[in-house]
A protein has these predicted regions:
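Charge-rich, low-complexity N-terminal segments
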Residues: 1-139
């Protein structure tokens, strides 16, 4: 539900012609980082989706995916890039980042898919994300 909440916040904060950016770090499996861990019984319903699905606007995002402690880390990074390409939001590579562009829903869906990939295939990973809308400068 983390991505439903973050997407809900971003979509509801959006204003036409107003520049806005989000910087976020999503991680799982960090050794020793369990103090705030908790399990809440929840269902699979994305509670914000029904309220934001009609909000349409394009975003630019730069992402970095870090599979920690993996000798074959480049294979995991390549899988993440391929996922973005297959979903039609991969724009280009830059220095240590991939640039994603597209509708806010499509970009957030890919971010969630990348996170799920990490959850299913890695014990420790970090997804660093910047999302921008209405930037006055070329991203």
């Amino acid at each position: 539900h983390v991505f439903d909440v973050v997407k809900g916040l971003f979509a509801n904060a959006y204003r036409e012609d107003v520049h806005m950016a989000l910087e976020a770090t999503f991680a799982k499996g960090c050794p020793g980082d369990t103090d705030a861990d908790s399990f809440m019984e929840v269902d699979d319903e994305k509670v914000n989706e029904k309220n934001i699905r009609d909000k349409k606007f394009d975003v630019v995002s730069k992402i970095s995916f870090y599979p920690m402690g993996e000798e074959d880390y480049m294979e995991h990074i390549a899988k993440v890039v391929m996922t973005a390409k297959e979903r039609g939001v991969f724009a280009r590579s830059s220095h240590y980042v991939s640039i994603l562009e597209g509708d806010v829903h499509n970009v957030f869906d890919v971010l969630e898919e990348i996170f799920k990939y990490g959850e299913e295939n890695l014990s420790h990973y970090i997804l660093q994300v910047t999302i921008s809308v209405n930037s006055p400068t070329k991203e």
